[in-house]
């Protein structure tokens, strides 16, 4: 049932697994579901993968909503590419399930589902979604997205939502003499834990406390 799906997603909040699969029932000939299909008022595909389209508990619309949530779960959680952003986004939603479902509807409404997106573009869409919610303090979400980008790689292209790096580039260069081999990013917020319960490593330093090394 839909409520059960939501509860399973809440269990994820406690366990914080690195991967979570949101599966769908199939009606295979000879299986328990096949024998009880009429009792459950199950309507399912006549061809592989024989997925259930609706039951007496779940409408076709419910199934479609779950599929949207599943796709966003794969993109934003199971990919492990947006851990801090997702952790933060959860705090302004009733549950993780509602978060992924609503995000899926946002993708659908804007025609993003059928497109191929880069990781930075996925972050941009996530921020567009947050902006659509009317969040007062967007800066913390901008910086969370920046953290997710630079904690994985020294991105060649600066994300358009990120702060202008030029304001502290000369100062931080003293700590990164080899430039392209290192990156120091400055944040106004402390991100203590990501969506997987892992502690966030100190990739950031405070610009106001930087001191040039003496030779």
Predicted regions span which residues?
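A structural motif corresponding to the C-terminal lobe/cap of the Radical SAM core domain
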Residues: 5-8, 12-98
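Extended interaction regions within the primary functional domain
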Residues: 48, 205, 215
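Radical SAM enzyme core and accessory elements
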Residues: 71-210
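Single conserved hydrophobic/aromatic residue that forms the stacking wall/gate
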Residues: 1-7, 11, 209-215
């Amino acid at each position: 049932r839909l409520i059960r799906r939501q509860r399973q997603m809440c269990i994820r909040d406690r366990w914080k697994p690195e991967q979570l699969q949101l599966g769908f029932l199939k009606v295979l000939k000879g299986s328990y579901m096949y024998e009880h299909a009429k009792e459950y008022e199950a309507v399912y595909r006549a061809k592989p993968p024989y997925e259930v389209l609706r039951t007496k508990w779940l409408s076709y619309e419910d199934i479609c909503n779950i599929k949207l949530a599943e796709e966003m779960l794969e993109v934003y959680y199971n990919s492990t590419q947006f851990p801090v952003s997702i952790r933060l986004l959860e705090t302004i939603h009733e549950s993780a399930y509602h978060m992924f479902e609503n995000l899926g509807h946002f993708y659908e409404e804007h025609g993003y589902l059928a497109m191929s997106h880069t990781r930075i573009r996925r972050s941009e869409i996530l921020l567009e979604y947050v902006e659509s919610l009317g969040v007062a303090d967007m800066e913390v979400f901008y910086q969370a997205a920046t953290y997710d980008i630079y904690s994985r790689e020294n991105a060649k292209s600066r994300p358009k939502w990120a702060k202008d790096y030029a304001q502290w580039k000369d100062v931080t260069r003293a700590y990164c003499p080899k430039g392209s081999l290192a990156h120091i990013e400055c944040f106004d917020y402390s991100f203590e834990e990501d969506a997987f319960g892992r502690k966030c490593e100190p990739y950031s330093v405070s610009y106001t406390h930087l001191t040039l090394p003496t030779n």
